[in-house]
């Protein structure tokens, strides 16, 4: 859950988001070391009186500043590729939910059930109850079972949208005429908020996403009532 004046990322709720946080720290540490080295060299150049105006060739230095950046890029690229392949893997999902973007709301269809579908609109500010979040609450939450692999099929009925839930490490484009897919798994119950992350018109800011992750028994009860 995000909070006011937050500087860092949201707490991870899924294995993918945990991996993304670790990769973020890994890349940030490399950037910090590079920046420190550059600042150190600049400070030496500004304070030393030694000059090398007559140097015409320095193959050793050129070799170092060619090989070292290549090694650094490999250290960043390999973990990144690993996470990308992990995000693309969808093995034996327990549930499939189809999400369609509209101007300016989301519709959901539980494809494993015969007649379980609904639209999800933002609740206007004047209709919010005490404790509810402005611009983030919806009239119909997406209820899903926790600790289970869920496949999300995402598309759009009109313009480009993007279905994003930061704490789960999810951000998938909703493209008209194209069906994208992603997978999610929440490790603990709760409400997880997201928003459309692709500018899609005048009410782009009013397309929130709310996932309600519950134990499997609660989900089965809810789905039976909805059907």
Curated annotation (Swiss-Prot):
Residue numbers carrying Phosphotyrosine: 218
Mitochondrial intermembrane membrane side: 1-14, 88-227
Binding sites annotated in the UniProt record for Mg(2+): 198
Annotated TM spans: 15-45, 60-87
Source taxon at top rank: Eukaryota
Main location: mitochondrion
Bilayer topology annotation: Multi-pass membrane protein
SUPFAM superfamilies linked: Cupredoxins, Cytochrome c oxidase subunit II-like, transmembrane region
InterPro entries the record matches: CcO_II, CcO_II-like_C, CcO_II_C, Copper_CuA, Cupredoxin, Cyt_c_oxidase_su2, Cyt_c_oxidase_su2_TM_dom, Cyt_c_oxidase_su2_TM_sf
Keywords associated with the record: Copper, Electron transport, Magnesium, Membrane, Metal-binding, Mitochondrion, Mitochondrion inner membrane, Phosphoprotein, Respiratory chain, Translocase, Transmembrane, Transmembrane helix, Transport
Gene3D superfamilies: 1.10.287.90, Cupredoxins - blue copper proteins
Annotated catalysed reactions: 4 Fe(II)-[cytochrome c] + O2 + 8 H(+)(in) = 4 Fe(III)-[cytochrome c] + 2 H2O + 4 H(+)(out)
GO CC terms in record: mitochondrial inner membrane; respiratory chain complex IV
Binding site for Cu cation A2: 196, 198, 200, 204
Leading EC class: translocase
E.C. number: 7.1.1.9
Subcellular location: Mitochondrion inner membrane
Topological domain spans for side Mitochondrial matrix: 46-59
Residues annotated to bind Cu cation A1: 161, 196, 200, 207
Presence of keyword Acetylation: no
GO molecular function, one term: cytochrome-c oxidase activity
Oligomeric and partner information: Component of the cytochrome c oxidase (complex IV, CIV), a multisubunit enzyme composed of 14 subunits. The complex is composed of a catalytic core of 3 subunits MT-CO1, MT-CO2 and MT-CO3, encoded in the mitochondrial DNA, and 11 supernumerary subunits COX4I, COX5A, COX5B, COX6A, COX6B, COX6C, COX7A, COX7B, COX7C, COX8 and NDUFA4, which are encoded in the nuclear genome.
Family the entry assigns: Belongs to the cytochrome c oxidase subunit 2 family.
Function summary: Component of the cytochrome c oxidase, the last enzyme in the mitochondrial electron transport chain which drives oxidative phosphorylation. The respiratory chain contains 3 multisubunit complexes succinate dehydrogenase (complex II, CII), ubiquinol-cytochrome c oxidoreductase (cytochrome b-c1 complex, complex III, CIII) and cytochrome c oxidase (complex IV, CIV), that cooperate to transfer electrons derived from NADH and succinate to molecular oxygen, creating an electrochemical gradient over the inner membrane that drives transmembrane transport and the ATP synthase.
NCBIfam families recorded: CoxB (TIGR02866)
Protein name: Cytochrome c oxidase subunit 2
UniProt source species: Canis aureus (Golden jackal)
């Amino acid at each position: 859950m995000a909070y006011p004046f937050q500087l860092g990322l949201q707490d991870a709720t899924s294995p993918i988001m945990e991996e993304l946080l670790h990769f973020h720290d890994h890349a940030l540490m490399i950037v910090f070391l590079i920046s420190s080295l550059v600042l150190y060299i600049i400070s030496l150049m500004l304070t030393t009186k030694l000059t090398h105006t007559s140097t015409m060739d320095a193959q050793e230095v050129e070799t170092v500043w060619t090989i070292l950046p290549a090694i650094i890029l490999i250290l960043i690229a390999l973990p990144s590729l690993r996470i990308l392949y992990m995000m693309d893997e969808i093995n034996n999902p327990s549930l499939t939910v189809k999400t369609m973007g509209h101007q300016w709301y989301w519709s959901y269809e539980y494809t494993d059930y015969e007649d379980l579908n609904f639209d999800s609109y933002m609740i206007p500010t004047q209709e919010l109850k005490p404790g509810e979040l402005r611009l983030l609450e919806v009239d119909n939450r997406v209820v899903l079972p926790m600790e289970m692999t869920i496949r999300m099929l995402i598309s759009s009925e009109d313009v480009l949208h993007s279905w994003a839930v930061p704490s789960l490490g999810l951000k998938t484009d909703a493209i008209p005429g194209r069906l994208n897919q992603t997978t999610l798994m929440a490790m603990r119950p709760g409400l997880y908020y997201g928003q459309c992350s692709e500018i899609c018109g005048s009410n782009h800011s009013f397309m929130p996403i709310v996932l309600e992750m519950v134990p499997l028994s609660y989900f089965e009860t809810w789905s039976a009532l909805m059907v």
